[in-house]
């Protein structure tokens, strides 16, 4: 039975009911709806709507229902209730009779669903932060195990300067750290309780909403009833955070795909996260990484869809807002799956140290060191940049690395070059010189790993 049938003289068309009903997806809010109902029952005691005995009877029945939901949430889908609020109320009435009909006094589904989705989002933030933390720890562990794996760093997908695989890992630790902090920020803003706002103008009962907020695990009650039932900022913020984090994970996946390719052969991915071809028996495809990359668009699409849904809505609640749930459910599920899969990808990775070093020795990635060497000899940097560019062209024509040129050859371009030039052209020298905070020197990378381990412990 619908919660609003008294006003209507005709039954809803089945096609409309199927179109309108949301139980098939908002059943995921069952636990939050029950917990919110327990909190509301206590508030109704304070204003004399329920006796203490009635409240205890309701709470006992709701707790029993909560146990049933947790043991088999899919069973909810066998019901034809309009939404999760209707389902909970119906099951409560089945357990306690007419007493269950008193629970909705002073409450609207508008503030009820606003509460439910906020409570659900708060719980997901905690779960997502746990997954992000685990992935960061796995990246730090991988970095610690690969501090001596020298590889090319890239700009424009061209070899640029030598780095280490550890330094690459730590870059993603930083990105995920920002994702984690954005979740913390979002949590603080969503930690206000909308229950007691009614349909839009507030409840007619003198509920202590601040106490109600505390009872339900919030810091404070919301300040404006009209805003409270209309607000979906927390959903947009979480979708935004998810989208940005998925961009980070997609970049991670793209790097892995490139590093794993036959052309690079920098890393070997575990059989546990790769698949084969139905035709080509030699194939070992990086499907886990490709799916992470592909799913980024799905999450970003949910953000765009939510913004488009909200942008033209007048205050207060509109049925359009029912469209918030499927997007946030799917996006956060997808994000969490991708975080966990990225950690699994790292779990079995093998770095081909010989191949990464071989690649780092090519592409004249030590050219900047030669420019800095000339600067140290008194040549202005802009001039040294030009000189080294000409030197690289010559080396390419001679099919030689810079460190393979003789001093005489160097002197064709600058007479300040001496035998000491070879000391600064080695890969180790290139790394050691990048010793400012955040640089790729082994000392700084080791410090970054130690700091991250302490921060994440």
From Swiss-Prot:
Give compartment(s): Cytoplasm
What is one Gene Ontology biological process annotated in the Swiss-Prot or TrEMBL record? Answer: L-arginine biosynthetic process
Q: Please give the superkingdom of this protein's source.
A: Bacteria
Q: What is its EC number?
A: 4.3.2.1
**Pathway(s) where this gene product acts:** Amino-acid biosynthesis; L-arginine biosynthesis; L-arginine from L-ornithine and carbamoyl phosphate: step 3/3
Known catalytic reactions: 2-(N(omega)-L-arginino)succinate = fumarate + L-arginine
Q: Name one GO molecular function term.
A: argininosuccinate lyase activity
Q: Which Gene3D superfamilies match?
A: Fumarase/aspartase (C-terminal domain) (1.10.40.30), Fumarase/aspartase (Central domain) (1.20.200.10), Fumarase/aspartase (N-terminal domain) (1.10.275.10)
PANTHER family in UniProt: ARGININOSUCCINATE LYASE (PTHR43814:SF1)
Name of the protein: Argininosuccinate lyase
Native organism: Pasteurella multocida (strain Pm70)
Ranked from the top, the taxonomy reads:
Bacteria, Pseudomonadati, Pseudomonadota, Gammaproteobacteria, Pasteurellales
Which gene carries the instructions for this protein?
Answer: argH
């Amino acid at each position: 039975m619908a919660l609003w049938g008294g006003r209507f003289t005709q039954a809803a068309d089945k096609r409309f009911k199927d179109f309108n009903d949301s139980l098939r997806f908002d059943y995921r809010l069952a636990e939050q709806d029950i917990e919110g109902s327990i909190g509301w029952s206590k508030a109704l005691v304070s204003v004399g709507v329920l006796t203490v005995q009635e409240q205890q009877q309701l709470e006992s029945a709701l707790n029993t229902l909560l146990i049933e939901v947790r043991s088999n949430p899919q069973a909810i889908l066998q019901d034809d209730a309009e939404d999760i609020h209707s389902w909970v109320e119906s099951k409560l009435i089945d357990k306690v009779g007419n007493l269950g009909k008193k629970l909705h006094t002073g409450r609207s589904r508008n503030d009820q669903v606003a509460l439910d989705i906020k409570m659900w989002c708060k719980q997901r933030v905690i779960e997502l932060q746990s997954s992000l933390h685990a992935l960061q720890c796995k990246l730090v562990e991988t970095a610690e195990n690969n501090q001596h794996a020298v590889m090319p760093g890239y700009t424009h997908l061209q070899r640029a300067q030598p780095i280490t695989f550890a330094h690459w890992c730590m870059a993603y630790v930083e990105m995920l750290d920002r994702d984690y902090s954005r979740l913390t920020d979002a949590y603080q803003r969503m930690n206000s309780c909308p229950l007691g706002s009614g349909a839009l103008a507030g409840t007619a009962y003198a509920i202590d909403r601040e106490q109600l907020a505390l009872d339900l695990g919030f810091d404070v009650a919301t300040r404006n009833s009209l805003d409270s039932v209309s607000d979906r900022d927390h959903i947009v913020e979480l979708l935004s955070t998810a989208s940005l984090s998925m961009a980070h994970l997609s970049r991670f996946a793209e790097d892995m795909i490139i590093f794993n390719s036959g052309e690079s052969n920098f890393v070997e991915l575990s059989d546990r996260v790769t698949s084969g071809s139905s035709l080509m028996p030699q194939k070992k495809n990086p499907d886990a990484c490709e799916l992470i990359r592909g799913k980024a668009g799905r999450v970003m699409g949910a953000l765009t869809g939510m913004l488009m849904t909200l942008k033209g809505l007048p205050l207060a609640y509109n049925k359009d807002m029912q469209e918030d749930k499927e997007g946030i459910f799917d996006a956060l599920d997808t994000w969490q799956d991708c975080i966990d899969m990225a950690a699994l990808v790292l779990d079995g990775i093998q770095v081909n140290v010989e191949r990464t070093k071989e690649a780092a020795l090519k592409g004249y990635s030590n050219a900047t060191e030669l420019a800095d060497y000339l600067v140290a000899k008194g040549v202005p940097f802009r001039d040294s940049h030009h000189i080294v560019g000409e030197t690289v062209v010559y080396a390419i024509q001679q099919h030689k690395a810079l460190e393979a040129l003789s001093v005489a050859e160097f002197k064709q371009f600058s007479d300040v070059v001496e035998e000491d030039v070879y000391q600064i052209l080695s890969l180790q020298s290139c790394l050691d010189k990048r010793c400012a905070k955040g640089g790729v020197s082994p000392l700084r990378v080791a410090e970054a790993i130690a700091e991250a381990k302490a921060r994440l412990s």
